[in-house]
Amino acid sequence: MKLEDIRREYLQNALSEDNLLDDPFKQFETWLEHAVASNLPDPTAMVVATVDDTGQPSQRIVLLKHLDNDGFVFFTNTGSRKAQELKGNNKISLHFPWHPMERQVIVYGEAKPLPTSAVAKYFLSRPKESQLAAWASAQSRPVSSRKVLMETFANMKNKFAKGEIPLPDFWGGYCVVPQKIEFWQGGAHRLHDRFMYQRQADNSWQITRLNP
């Protein structure tokens, strides 16, 4: 297989500063709405990049669960690798790869832990099976087999058979407060359109076109 021959031209759209909204959150919402309306699979899926204390980065796909003018919100097991890395270094990057639309968005910022009340509100909105899975999984830690995992899930199902499933004390959430947000639109001949929003001291945003 010749990987160097695998390519395609990006011809769907062009992006100019005249097309951009002044507010990057509103611009993101507009693009996300387009992704949802276009029936893209998992339009809220984002690659979350963190770094450990040796400088080794790691990535994983997580779902965006809320967006407002404070930032981008996701939830996770606080014993997970990403949560442990964020304890030591809360710098974070998010990547939304909307390939069918020839678009991507990259967010650079800091992850701020959410208050327990916000975490509990979201946790209780999840399907019961997802709540049980949160209790059953010691995320990122070794497990001897899937059978063991499913047995733990069954035990949790029995344990919480009646009443409301409580919020695990090892489950939390983060708001990613962005300092920079890049919007990328594929262009013909690899002459892509890239615009970077950078937060200013007064919380306004400066927009700069970048070379592809």
UniProtKB/Swiss-Prot annotation:
In the record, biological process GO terms are: pyridoxine biosynthetic process
Please name the Gene3D superfamilies in this protein's record.
Electron Transport, Fmn-binding Protein, Chain A
Q: Which leading EC class covers this enzyme?
A: oxidoreductase
State where FMN binds: 60-65, 75-76, 81-82, 104, 139-140, 184, 194
Record: residues binding substrate:
7-10, 65, 122, 126, 130, 190-192
Which cofactors is this protein said to need?
FMN
Under the heading Pfam families, the entry gives:
PNP_phzG_C, PNPOx_N
Q: How is the cofactor bound?
A: Binds 1 FMN per subunit.
Could you list this entry's UniProt keywords, alphabetically sorted: Flavoprotein, FMN, Oxidoreductase, Pyridoxine biosynthesis
Q: What is its EC number?
A: 1.4.3.5
- Which PROSITE patterns would you find in this protein's record? PYRIDOX_OXIDASE
This enzyme catalyses:
pyridoxamine 5'-phosphate + O2 + H2O = pyridoxal 5'-phosphate + H2O2 + NH4(+); pyridoxine 5'-phosphate + O2 = pyridoxal 5'-phosphate + H2O2
Q: What pathway or pathways are given for this protein in its record? A: Cofactor metabolism; pyridoxal 5'-phosphate salvage; pyridoxal 5'-phosphate from pyridoxamine 5'-phosphate: step 1/1; Cofactor metabolism; pyridoxal 5'-phosphate salvage; pyridoxal 5'-phosphate from pyridoxine 5'-phosphate: step 1/1
How is the quaternary structure described? Answer: Homodimer.
Describe the task this protein carries out.
Answer: Catalyzes the oxidation of either pyridoxine 5'-phosphate (PNP) or pyridoxamine 5'-phosphate (PMP) into pyridoxal 5'-phosphate (PLP).
Q: Which family does it belong to?
A: Belongs to the pyridoxamine 5'-phosphate oxidase family.
The protein here is known as: Pyridoxine/pyridoxamine 5'-phosphate oxidase
From which organism does this entry originate? Pseudoalteromonas translucida (strain TAC 125)
